[in-house]
A protein has these predicted regions:
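Transmembrane alpha-helical segments of polytopic membrane transport and secretion proteins
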Residues: 1-22, 68-94, 118-147, 224-226, ...
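Membrane-water interface segments at the C-terminal ends of transmembrane alpha-helices
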Residues: 14-40, 57-63, 88-115, 142-171, ...
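Hydrophobic alpha-helical segments
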Residues: 67-78, 340-392
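A short amphipathic helical element positioned immediately N-terminal to and/or at the very start
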Residues: 175-185, 463-475
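A short glycine-centered flexible hinge/capping loop motif at secondary-structure junctions
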Residues: 207, 314-316, 591-593
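Glycine-rich helix-loop "coupling/hinge" segments at transmembrane-helix boundaries
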Residues: 250, 349-374, 456-461, 626-653, ...
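The alpha-helix within a helix-turn-helix
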Residues: 311-312, 588
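Juxtamembrane inter-helical linkers in multi-pass membrane proteins
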Residues: 317, 406-421, 457-471
Length: 692
């Protein structure tokens, strides 16, 4: 007698029950409404009033609506029950929209419990889409994509929209479609706009020219002195805002030694000649030329020497080869460098503040509208929107037009050819310009470090430690210590988040195929195009009212640091993933390892140098940023650059320069330590390969 054994699959408990339960636990244990003074500084009565269950209000409905999803079988539904899964995803999205809309109408901010509830609803959407087998039914991929879209929408798209809202409202808060014309019709504002555009174009031309000079020297002329290029690629990154402008002031300001020399030897009468267009242009060219240099340096290295060799073979002279072959191949890089510098010049806030004089630009004008004696959101929004639109136009030209053109010179042919000599006149001109550039920068940074040790620049050059004593000799709770420690803390939190978030976006963009992939990449890269001043104002407008109150908190400072630098993590991740064959991922997945395990065990070890580079760059940029967070900091959330700004506004240039010098030394030390660690890891891997 035989028996047939039927194997029935074990039915799993539906995880949606657990996520709904998590939402109710958050409702019971955490405040559903925001607290004006935070969880640690609020009174017991304020905390109790923030709990949703403390009184009957709309927040009860926030948790009751998701509970309707519990009207279902206890066990997990199958793939065939597609209607059920679409209902789960749609209902979760509806609950999110209802929470945001009702909190906005109530005029109250969302609390910690609602953050947990949003996570639970997002998880329910992820489960539903996974069961529908979207993107292959990979839960991690769908969850990552959901989180990316949500964060981009909240912290990039919404602030970019929020900055336009005050443009169309009057003083009474009523809709006024032409309110912004009252600002743009002012003669002073028109002049400010023209000043900004004229300055940015002039700076773009200057930086592109000097960047090309530096790039030609390091790639085609220098042999052992190519380290100069590396020095100039690091210095502007670690130089805090205001420091370059202050250094130029020490050299050529009213009491600068170059100005005094010109007065004594050439009879100069106008000692204020630096302040205005000339001073801003000079400081920005010094600050942004290394950015153009890095772009052009990489472009020149990719030019195939065989093309120039072919030109010489056809009896072309050195100048004909340079003008007919070399320069045309650099056109996309030249345009790219020019456009990026134009955007950086428009966004620059620190140098015009120090050297502007009566020459007003958009970035400083927006700052004064927000922090001046008379708050004017309409004017700040109008100028910010104009600056944003102009920067986006430049960015779109760079991204869509230049990015689509082909200037390929590296083919599959094995013969590469030899680099041909440049015209002798060009070589000597480049060397002469480079000598002037090096001498000027040596004087600049020498003045910065020497000026931090003087009593009063231009009056008393006696060496002293008074500036450093005022900064760091008054105890840990006074002077510069609080701002320095807070800055290191915020940057230390923001840097790993930036690197991880950027790598996650890069992995989704490079390794996954779905509709809207280009939109996600383009939207995240907009962070580079949005000027820092505009980003700061937009965050104030977006997160200073219901349903999300973040202004005045450390969270908004950290979020700003992350979102401003996340494109760096994305680009580092895309570059790193481009060097890793996709077959490694496929082999891992074929062995039933999930996407998360593949990332942690396969990709992350291989991407370690790229991650460390993104980490250190994000850390340094977070420390030196000013234009975005200057609007977001408070006395309780102090940062180093805001402290330097306050010293500049108070005329304490010596203290500001001393603080900047300390930051330069600290960040250079951090960069070289990380560079040494990356180099050690590469060396150890190379030794392991050789031994194998």
């Amino acid at each position: 007698m035989s028996h047939t054994l039927a194997l029935h699959p074990v039915k799993k408990r539906d995880a949606i029950f657990l996520w709904v339960l998590l939402g109710w636990l958050a409702f019971a244990l955490l405040p559903s409404w925001s607290l004006d003074y935070g969880l640690l500084e609020s009174t017991g009565e304020e905390i109790l009033a923030a709990y949703g269950w403390s009184q009957f209000n709309i927040s009860w409905l926030w948790y009751l609506l998701p509970s309707l999803l519990l009207v279902r079988p206890f066990h997990e539904a199958r793939r065939e029950q597609g209607g059920r899964h679409y209902l789960d995803a749609g209902w979760a999205f509806f609950c999110m929209a209802f929470i945001v809309a009702s909190a906005t109408l109530e005029g109250r901010g969302l609390g910690y419990a609602t953050i947990v509830l949003f996570v639970a609803l997002g998880a329910i959407m992820t489960l539903a889409l996974t069961r529908l087998e979207w993107l292959g039914g990979d839960r991690f991929v769908i969850g990552s994509l959901t989180a990316i879209v949500a964060l981009i929408g909240i912290f990039i798209v919404w602030p970019s929209i929020a900055i336009f809202i005050p443009m169309f409202t009057n003083d009474a808060g009523e809709f006024a479609p032409l309110a912004f014309m009252n600002v743009l019709s002012q003669a002073h504002i028109i002049q400010v706009i023209l000043n900004s555009i004229m300055l940015s174009i002039a700076v773009g031309v200057g930086c592109t020219f000097f960047g090309l000079v530096l790039a030609i020297y390091t790639t085609r002329i220098a042999r052992r002195s190519a380290i100069i290029g590396r020095i100039f690629s690091i210095l502007p990154i670690v130089t805090p805002p205001f420091v370059v402008g202050l250094g130029v002031t020490l050299m050529m300001g009213r009491s600068g030694y170059i100005t005094e020399f010109m007065v004594e030897w050439f009879g100069l009468t106008n000692t204020n000649w630096l302040y205005g267009f000339t001073g801003i242009w000079l400081a920005q060219v010094l600050a942004f030329t290394p950015m153009a240099f890095m772009i052009l340096d990489g472009a020149i290295k990719t030019i195939h020497p065989s093309l120039e060799e072919a030109s010489y073979t056809l009896r072309a002279s050195r100048w004909q080869t340079f003008n007919g072959v070399f320069v045309p191949l650099l056109k996309p890089a030249l345009a790219n460098a020019f456009l990026i510098v134009v955007v950086q010049s428009l966004a620059d806030f620190s140098n015009p503040l120090v050297l502007g004089g009566n020459f007003d630009v958009l970035a400083t004008q927006i700052y004064f509208y927000i922090t001046g004696s008379q708050l004017d959101y309409l004017a700040a929004s109008t100028l910010g929107a104009f600056l944003l639109l102009f920067s986006l136009l430049v960015f779109c030209v760079q991204y869509m037009w230049i990015g689509k053109r082909s200037y390929v010179t590296v083919s599959g042919k094995s013969y590469r050819g030899d680099v041909q000599p440049l015209p002798v006149t060009l070589v000597w001109s480049v060397v002469a310009l480079l000598a002037v550039w090096i001498a000027f920068n040596a004087l600049l940074y020498g003045s910065i470090f020497y000026g931090s040790f003087t009593v009063n620049w231009g009056v008393d050059y006696t060496l002293t430690l008074a500036n450093f004593t005022k900064l760091f000799g008054q105890g840990m709770s006074d002077g510069a210590w609080p701002s320095l420690l807070d800055t290191l803390l915020y940057a230390g939190i923001a840097a790993p988040i930036t690197a991880i978030f950027g790598l996650l976006i890069a992995w989704v963009v490079v390794r996954q195929q779905f509709k809207g992939k280009k939109t996600i990449e383009f939207t995240t890269m907009l962070c580079f195009a949005v000027p820092g001043t505009v980003a700061g104002v937009s965050y104030i407008l977006a997160f200073n009212s219901a349903p999300v109150y973040l202004t005045g908190t450390a969270a908004i400072v950290i979020i700003s640091m992350v979102m401003r630098n996340v494109p760096v993590g994305i680009r580092a991740g895309i570059a790193g993933l481009g060097q890793i064959d996709k077959s490694l991922d496929e082999a891992s997945l074929s062995l039933r390892a999930g996407s998360l395990r593949t990332i942690t065990h396969i990709l992350l070890p291989l991407l370690r140098p790229a991650i460390l580079s993104a980490l250190i760059y994000s850390f340094v940029r977070a420390i030196t940023t000013v234009s975005a967070i200057v609007f977001l900091v408070t006395p309780d959330t102090r940062v180093a650059t805001a402290y330097i700004l306050n010293r500049v506004e108070d005329g304490e240039y010596g203290v500001a320069i001393a603080y900047g010098s300390i930051l330069i030394v600290v960040m250079l030390a951090i960069i070289f330590i990380f560079d040494w660690l990356i180099g050690e890891s590469r060396t150890s891997r190379s030794k392991a390969k050789n031994q194998a």
